């Protein structure tokens, strides 16, 4: 319910002891399952009301100022943009009228789903990041941070954030992040928080270090500090472009001064948000369902993401493509089987636990809304888990559009599709079979 207005809700949970292996967190952390249920429910409600699935989502979408899923104020949302852009790119209006009375063994269907996923887990968890930025005598910078690099290209993003604020190149930023003896406290890389929280601390630390740099440069140039700016590793006087000084010269002068005023420019800052900026998205899927074998093939996916201003668009697309492949596996092939009598896992290798390969991937069109979040570093929000949330329900809704059966469990292997079709046909009058 994270992206829909729904004041009338309640929930309960039970703890049950089992003889099965313990479960733990993974990419998406339960949101995939909730979204699989919620987004099919939204389609069912739209069908019952006789309205377009897009319209029911737009009508009930949360707006800026509403309370986000974590209980904090929602700072930005462009879910409406995601839906409208996605519908245009996918050709939703043309495809939504697909004939349910298709003949032949292969039936085509089209479905959509929207999603939101947290950018950090405040206030449920400790949401605390720290960073230190230190200038070296050659004008390069040491960035001392400790996010967990789990494949999300976080060090690259942090280098870009730091470099952008300081007016230097990303390659001038040296990350020191693999030794807890010298780094500051860091909560960790989860809940799609690293770019947002660690990036927020990095940006604040860079601003603090830059203020010291500019103060020293103002003295060297004999101009007001408020009239200085940094670009391409040079400090400029805005009223006279010819009056400038390289960052390296300022840093060298400060470090190796012999009059008792020598110093090293650095900034050390923390980031602990008091707001929430979830990522939003819309997924549109085109599938083919073989009614004789039950096999579902995903032929095309259109993904539109509101992740604020992307720090590195290519890395964002890479994150989404990888997450989408994971989600296709969750939706169609990855079946974690446990023997009920013993609790022993039966799918112990990739010959039985089937993950999709590059050959199984559909054509994927990814579009980034690229509108800034007011609280994120340079407008960024998290995106690492967003691709794992909306794909499965979009596929399930497309299956329903193709053959008229609702899939209520994940994954959706051929045998479940055949069973659902058999149940549907058994309920028909003899004249329709």
Where are these regions (language model features)?
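Cofactor-binding beta-sheet edge motifs in enzyme active sites
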Residues: 1-81, 88, 97-433
């Amino acid at each position: 319910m994270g992206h829909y207005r729904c004041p009338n809700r309640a929930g309960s949970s039970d703890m049950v002891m089992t003889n099965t292996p313990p479960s733990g967190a993974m990419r998406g952390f339960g949101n995939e399952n909730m979204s699989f249920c919620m987004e099919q429910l939204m389609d069912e409600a739209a069908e019952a009301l006789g309205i377009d699935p897009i319209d029911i989502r737009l009508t009930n979408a949360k707006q800026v100022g509403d309370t986000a899923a974590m209980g904090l104020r929602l700072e930005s949302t462009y879910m409406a943009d995601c839906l409208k852009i996605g519908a245009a790119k996918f050709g939703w209006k043309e495809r939504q009228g697909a004939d349910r009375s298709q003949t032949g063994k292969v039936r085509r269907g089209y479905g959509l789903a929207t999603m939101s996923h947290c950018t950090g887990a405040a206030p449920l968890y400790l949401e605390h990041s720290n960073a230190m930025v230190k200038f070296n005598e050659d004008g390069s910078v040491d960035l001392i941070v400790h996010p967990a690099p789990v494949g999300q290209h976080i060090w690259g993003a942090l280098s870009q954030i730091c470099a952008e604020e300081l007016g230097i190149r990303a390659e001038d930023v040296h990350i020191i992040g693999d030794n807890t003896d010298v780094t500051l406290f860091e909560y960790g890389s989860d809940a799609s928080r690293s770019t947002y929280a660690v990036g927020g601390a990095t940006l604040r630390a860079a601003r603090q270090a830059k203020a010291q740099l500019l103060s020293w440069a103002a003295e060297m140039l004999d101009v007001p500090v408020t009239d200085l700016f940094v670009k391409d590793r040079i400090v400029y006087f805005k009223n006279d472009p010819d009056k400038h000084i390289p960052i390296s010269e300022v840093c060298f002068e400060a470090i190796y001064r012999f009059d008792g005023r020598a110093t090293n420019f650095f900034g050390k800052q923390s980031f602990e948000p008091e707001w929430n900026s979830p990522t939003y998205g819309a997924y549109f899927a085109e599938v083919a369902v073989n009614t004789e074998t039950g096999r579902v093939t995903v032929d095309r996916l259109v993904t539109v993401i509101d992740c604020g201003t992307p720090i590195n668009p290519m890395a964002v697309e890479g994150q989404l493509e990888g997450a989408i492949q994971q989600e296709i596996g969750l939706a169609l092939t990855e079946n974690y089987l446990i023997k009920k009598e013993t609790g022993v896992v039966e799918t112990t290798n990739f010959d039985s636990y089937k993950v999709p390969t590059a050959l199984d991937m559909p054509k994927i069109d990814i579009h980034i809304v690229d509108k800034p979040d007011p609280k994120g570093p340079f407008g960024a929000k998290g995106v690492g888990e967003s691709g794992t949330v909306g794909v499965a329900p979009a596929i399930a809704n497309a299956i329903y559009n193709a053959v008229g059966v609702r899939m209520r469990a994940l994954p959706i292997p051929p045998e479940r599709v055949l069973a659902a079709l058999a149940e549907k046909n058994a309920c028909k009058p003899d004249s329709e079979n």
